Amino acid sequence: MVYDLDMLKAFYASFEKKIGRVRAVLQRPLTLAEKILYTHLYDDALLKKYKRGEDYVNFRPDRVAMQDATAQMALLQFINAGKETVAVPSTVHCDHLIQAYKGAGPDIATATESNREVYDFLRDVSSRFGIGFWKPGAGIIHQVVLENYAFPGGMMVGTDSHTPNAGGLGMVAIGVGGADAVDVMTGMEWELKMPKLIGVHLKGALNGWASPKDVILKLAGILTVKGGTNAIIEYFGEGTASLSATGKATICNMGAEVGATTSLFPYDERMKVYLEATGRKEVAAMADAVSADLQADAEVVADPSAYYDRVIEIDLSELEPYINGPFTPDAATPISEFAEKVLAHGYPRKMEVGLIGSCTNSSYQDLSRAASIARQVDEKQLSVAAPLIVNPGSEQIRATAERDGMIDAFLKIGATIMANACGPCIGQWKRHTDDPLRKNSIVTSFNRNFAKRADGNPNTHAFVASPEVVLALTIAGDLCFNPLKDALINQEGEKVKLRVPEGDELPSTGFTQGNPGYLAPAGAQVEIKVNPESQRLQLLAPFPAWDGKDFTDMPLLIKAQGKCTTDHISMAGPWLRFRGHLENISDNMLMGAVNAFNGETNKVWNRLTNTYEGVSGTAKQYKAEGISSIVVAEENYGEGSSREHAAMEPRFLNVKVILAKSFARIHETNLKKQGMLAVTFIDKADYDKIQEHDLITVSGLADFAPGRNLTVTLHHEDGTQDSFEVQHTYNEQRIGWFRAGSALNAR
């Protein structure tokens, strides 16, 4: 079924004309990203040349997607917007709240019961306001979007940082916070700083054990976790045509791990075949008709350095598998060097669990190639040394994989087939372990591997690889095993080698839908109820407006040391149940951040009691006494998920300022949307001047203006002071949000 066909017809009917107008204004060859961005300006009158990395631009995305953990807060905000229906096609996907424990059937039953209040709320709000609703078990948001909604040349936003997955079908798909999604759903302009462009030239074709996952694992090592910040990664070159649409999606998905605004590939035959295989021949035909404009112009490809801000070249034919980690996705190591790294760093060598699936690697091709490794266990009389967990990406993938024997291949080697949901990838894993703090190693085909993320254990060394490499290491049970060259000892004592993985890009007999789990909206007669006594859901009260004064004598809540992701700021896992209740989820605020003064988590000095207490509890005491506070952090603060709770919680607990060395893009926007002051050090050495007992003043707010620095004064306990300037990236509109108390208040 083709969803929103009228919208798609209108889009493609006007696409060439819009491109023509863009060419007339810019007067130069265009990259694919530019074509999509400039044809999605909020109003034709906005068409002019914008400076990349500097100018803020108003856009009109084509659609919105939300997952159940972030949709709660987004829809609570949408309810307050006073609209009768959404302005653009929108969907909600129930994939984050299902805990992986016993297997798909019992886990979905448990989730349905334990999350009934939240699911009913999301279903009713969706039905009331014209939003498509995908039930628990239907699939992971990004796989379902790729199978049903993504289209070449389009633009979408999603309340999940891995929304760029849709770039595998040539779409500019951007992860945002809920407040941004509300802007789009209410028909307002959606603002974004015009991204810089990183061009990645792909040459050759993959071979052997190398997979699309290895392209982005290698690139993560080149760019690091913040190298793509405020940039779009655009892939081009002859190598792109050798990759399947789902392989392209894998690469775009993990662009989030380098901080990229989004990633995308040019339209080609592989995308066309995928659209047709997923029941969208009509969409493929419309894209074919404008295919010349669904890729970078020939002049761009011929001289990329003249059009991209940075160009990186990767030869696919020379690429080997990578294994990234632990604790950060940019710790990239080719498999030929990985054993040496494991031994040199003393990582736990024993591979304890292999996990495949997630939104990054759960396509038909992924499972097909992994199953080809699993089948060799019986064929070569091997034993499997570690447990295997499989999360299919959607019900369509699961049902088709079951029909084609892949699920059986996994079950035969002892795998547990979990729900078509995120599960362990976002911390929804009730792991079978007798010691939750034991030092151990796991390897996954997921996208992130932050400490505590998968199972809550800070000593779990999580590594990221392709599904086929995960399978090989699961069989071996040894991180030092290299399937490209090492042999295994089978049950007969013989040395055997695993064959190179193989698998079909798409099912030769077509997909089978299984039980798709889609619920179309019913309309305005649906009543929305929120129990005021609920511990899961809470209607939102507006945040107070700025009082017109400088922030004076604020105690330091925490000076965070090292990596401070959204997982550190607002943990997922068991806390997901409170994602619709701001007061309750605020109890986890910054509990994972490391205090620079004692090296501990969730233990900060409380000025009121002169004792060390939890971060949230301390902030609550300050709030109760009418005291504002400040958080100080290092680089790339807010890296990771799009969850706006990481911005709303400090706002709710009266934290006024986040002062960091740098911010991750989505989180910085989320802070601004909630009326927070997000500023950065001009001289990063000033971070070291901040002392634990300081009272901190931020002045200059009466003259708050774009490009004008603010002043921070540190009042030290010994009576001395330090003062320095800090910078910000607020424009006039965002300063308006700050003054109003939030973007919603400023409507």
Give residue ranges: language-model regions.
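Mobile "lid/hinge" segments at catalytic clefts and subdomain interfaces of large enzymes
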Residues: 3-4, 68, 151-285, 382, ...
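Extracellular/luminal Protease-associated
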Residues: 236-241, 624-663
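Long, structured ligand/cofactor-binding scaffold of large enzymes
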Residues: 8-11, 15, 20-195, 579-631, ...
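Acidic, glycine-rich flexible loop/linker segments
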Residues: 488-505, 667-737, 744-746
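Flexible inter-domain linker/hinge segments
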Residues: 5-7, 16-21, 27, 36-42, ...
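Extended active-site and interfacial segments that coordinate phosphate-rich ligands
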Residues: 167-195, 467, 569-588, 651-656, ...
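Accessory "access/gating" subregions that flank catalytic or transport cores
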Residues: 109-113, 118, 123-127, 131-157, ...
